């Protein structure tokens, strides 16, 4: 059995997404993590915040934080899914 490391992924979502669309987006990423064997998934919607500087012509955006345990393969799949999703403005994954 492979060792699971703890990770935190923070992603910034376009402000024009509705609450329902944002909830579906969050659920899809949680489902992706669960399918690939991630454990202890904790997701926090940090709400809509003003950005310190403009990112892709946006002054504010929704912040979502996910903490979970997984392996490197899970991180690669999650980040690949975020790269192709046009609703994601920016994301960052760190080991904790």
UniProtKB/Swiss-Prot annotation:
Gene: rps6
Chief subcellular location: plastid
Lineage of origin: Eukaryota, Cryptophyceae, Pyrenomonadales, Geminigeraceae, Guillardia
CDD domains for this protein: bS6_chloro_cyano (cd15487)
Keyword list, A-Z: Chloroplast, Plastid, Ribonucleoprotein, Ribosomal protein, RNA-binding, rRNA-binding
Protein name, entry field: Small ribosomal subunit protein bS6c
Domain of life: Eukaryota
Xref: SUPFAM superfamilies: Ribosomal protein S6 (SSF54995)
Organism in which the protein naturally occurs: Guillardia theta (Cryptophyte)
UniProt cross-references to InterPro entries, sorted A to Z: Ribosomal_bS6, Ribosomal_bS6_sf, Ribosomal_S6_plastid/chlpt, Transl_elong_EF1B/ribsomal_bS6
């Amino acid at each position: 059995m492979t060792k699971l490391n703890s990770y935190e992924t923070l992603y910034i979502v376009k402000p024009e997404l509705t609450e329902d669309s944002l909830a579906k987006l969050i659920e899809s990423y949680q489902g992706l993590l669960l399918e690939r064997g991630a454990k202890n998934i904790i997701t926090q919607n940090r709400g809509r915040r003003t950005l310190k500087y403009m990112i892709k012509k946006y002054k504010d955006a929704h912040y979502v934080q996910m903490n979970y345990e997984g392996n490197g393969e899970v991180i690669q799949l999650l980040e690949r899914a975020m790269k192709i999703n046009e609703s994601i403005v920016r994301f960052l994954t760190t080991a904790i």
